[in-house]
């Protein structure tokens, strides 16, 4: 597997100065909330003397400024306009002005600040102190009751996309309540926030787009990406999830509308891994799209051009990666998400030695699948080296999983990696990958080209290779046909079948099909969720090989240890930590993944194992090493509970 070597620098960006020329008379003293004084909209560049700025100063006392229209000197101006008695520029529409506002986060403004808003949970004392009287109904309710109320509302919706939109709206109005809701009801809401619903949300992103989430960097920003990153209001970024939208789940090229993926992933970093929301930055790199339907869609929000490739693409990505390091330092995690195969492998290889990069499609998927296979050994016995693996799909996920399995076999059995690969076979769109095809296949497939006669059909490959484990990463639905599953069941007492493609419509087979066609003997897991299946009086609970088991805890482990490079051994440590979470009660139901309801505890344990491995390898920079890493992970997690305001 590709060994990653990341490095980033953490430096603090200086906020440019504000040039709005306001002359104020003697200020009056009033009580202010513990929020911030906001002057203006976005961050301007250092070269712009009249650049628009956002200034935030935390209130340390109970005094602030209050002015009336009469307090403003009539001739003071903003960006050259002629100011009237009300402090507004009396300019024509043709005269450029600087749009600005002066507000304190209290009262009406406080209710519309998602970071501080508590809705009806503001106490009577807080309502008096922060000018909220009359702006809210008189009742005061707890955060728990708010959660109960919203869950009641969400359950009235019949369409998953409606639930998704309601959750995104909540995130933009009351951040802490959003995360409280997601943490408390993670098993029910995870399919809403992420797969499979996020796939439909990305497909319809232009139609449902209301307000921007994340940072959009297009070819139009080439040469200015450093300044664009400074427009983001938060400066202490710890995790970036970035996509170029070319391979969104199993849905293909969705261009700029792939932003739903970074937003969703980072929501899970916070809810499941405890990374602060303010430390997360979703980014979409827009280089166009080859999706004709989107190019002709009047609601499409991205560049209306064919996708840039080659040098133009590489230069934009290199500028982005360089700017990230300059702005946020060398210890920020950069997670590549849903890039096309060729770019995914190239970016990982190119920046693995200079940045702290992680590809969830290659490495996260591999780690969670390996965890499931380790757990499945409880049912089938033996070690991984005793099994034979056949993959349908030889892209990022397929080759990434195959390489991590081979690495685990190599380490546990003390055999060369090349020898460990011989029990792993891959099938792509042209059939079984064999030595005779070596000259015509992509470089990342070549390690899996073994000596064998060519085979075109999957069912024939199953009969010839006789695998004990069948893994689907093809992105093509219904490819594990009845013939394929029945053949696996004839060859094995307990065939392991993993149908990993997302979303549900692209799954190689359903849970019901796997259990029925194998007479209830299959050990099954999927990429998208399936309901429990009853077969001949026994209830089977299909596992979901969801990357959300791994990447939140993995990222937290990197952050808490100050790791400067991702190493393959960290992925193995994460897999083993997840497999250890299975209890006897889970095995009795045929499960190879633990329930999601304990995901924060699981993430803390994964983080501890990843951090421990980083310290062992000498890649951690946060010294000295904490004695209790799991306790350290738990204590560093973000809490969504409301805070009391003075």
From Swiss-Prot:
Disulfide bridge positions per record: none
Pfam families: malic, Malic_M
Active site: 194 (proton donor), 265 (proton acceptor)
Transit peptide: 1-74
GO MF, one annotated term: zinc ion binding
CC cofactor note: Divalent metal cations. Prefers magnesium or manganese.
Protein name: NADP-dependent malic enzyme 4, chloroplastic
Organism: Arabidopsis thaliana
């Amino acid at each position: 597997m590709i060994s990653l070597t990341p490095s980033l620098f953490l430096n603090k960006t200086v906020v440019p100065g504000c040039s709005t020329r306001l002359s104020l008379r003697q200020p009056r003293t009033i009580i202010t909330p513990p929020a911030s004084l906001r002057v203006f909209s976005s961050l301007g560049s250092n070269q712009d003397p009249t650049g628009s700025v956002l200034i935030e100063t935390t209130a340390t006392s109970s005094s602030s400024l209050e002015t009336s229209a009469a307090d403003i000197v009539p001739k003071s101006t903003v960006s050259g306009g002629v100011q009237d008695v009300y402090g507004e520029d009396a300019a024509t529409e043709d005269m450029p002005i600087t749009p600005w506002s002066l507000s304190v986060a209290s009262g009406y403004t406080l209710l519309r600040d998602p970071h501080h808003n508590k809705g009806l949970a503001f106490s009577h004392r807080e309502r008096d102190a922060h000018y909220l009287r009359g702006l809210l109904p008189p009742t005061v309710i707890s955060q728990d009751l708010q959660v109960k109320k919203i869950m009641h509302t969400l359950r009235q919706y019949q369409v998953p996309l409606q639930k998704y939109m309601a959750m995104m709206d909540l995130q933009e109005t009351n951040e802490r309540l959003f995360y409280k809701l997601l943490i408390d009801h993670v098993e029910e809401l995870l399919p809403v926030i992420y797969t499979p619903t996020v796939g439909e949300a990305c497909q319809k992103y232009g139609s449902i787009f209301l307000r921007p989430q994340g940072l959009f960097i297009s070819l139009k920003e080439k040469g200015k990406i450093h300044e664009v990153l400074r427009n983001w209001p938060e400066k202490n970024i710890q995790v970036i999830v970035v996509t170029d939208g070319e391979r969104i789940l199993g849905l293909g090229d969705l261009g700029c509308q792939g932003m739903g993926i970074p937003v969703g992933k980072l929501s899970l970093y916070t809810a499941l891994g405890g990374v602060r929301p303010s430390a997360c930055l979703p980014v979409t790199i827009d280089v166009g799209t080859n999706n004709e339907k989107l190019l002709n869609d009047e609601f499409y929000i991205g560049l209306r051009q064919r996708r840039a490739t080659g040098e133009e693409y590489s230069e934009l990505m290199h500028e982005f990666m360089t700017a990230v390091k300059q702005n946020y330092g060398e210890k920020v995690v950069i997670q590549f998400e849903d890039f096309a195969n060729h770019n995914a492998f190239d970016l990982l290889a190119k920046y693995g030695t200079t940045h702290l990069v992680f590809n969830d499609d290659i490495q996260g998927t591999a780690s969670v699948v390996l965890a499931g296979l380790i757990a499945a050994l409880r049912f089938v016995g033996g070690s991984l080296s005793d099994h034979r693996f056949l993959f349908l799909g030889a892209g990022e996920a397929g080759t990434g999983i195959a390489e991590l399995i081979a690495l685990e076999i190599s380490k546990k059995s003390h055999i060369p990696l090349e020898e460990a690969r011989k029990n792993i076979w891959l099938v792509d769109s042209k059939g079984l990958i064999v030595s005779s095809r070596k000259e015509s296949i992509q470089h990342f497939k070549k390690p899996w080209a073994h000596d064998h006669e060519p085979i075109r059909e999957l069912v024939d490959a199953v009969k010839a290779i006789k695998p004990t484990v069948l893994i689907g990463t093809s992105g093509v639905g219904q490819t594990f046909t009845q013939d394929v599953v029945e053949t696996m069941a004839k060859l094995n007492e307990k065939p392991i079948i993993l149908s990993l493609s997302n979303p549900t419509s692209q799954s190689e087979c359903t849970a019901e099909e796997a259990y029925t066609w194998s007479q209830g003997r299959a050990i099954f897991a999927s990429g998208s969720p399936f309901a429990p299946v009853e077969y001949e009086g026994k209830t089977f609970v299909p596992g979901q090989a969801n990357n959300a088991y791994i990447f939140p805890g993995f990222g937290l482990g990197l952050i808490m240890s100050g790791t400067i490079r991702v190493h393959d051994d960290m992925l193995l440590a994460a897999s083993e930590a997840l497999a250890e979470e299975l209890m006897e009660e889970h095995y009795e139901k045929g499960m190879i993944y633990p329930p999601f309801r304990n995901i924060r505890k699981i993430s803390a344990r994964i983080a501890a194992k990843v951090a421990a491995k980083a310290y062992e390898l000498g890649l951690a920079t946060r010294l000295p090493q904490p004695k209790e890493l799991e306790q350290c992970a738990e204590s560093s997690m973000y809490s969504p509970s409301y805070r009391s305001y003075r």
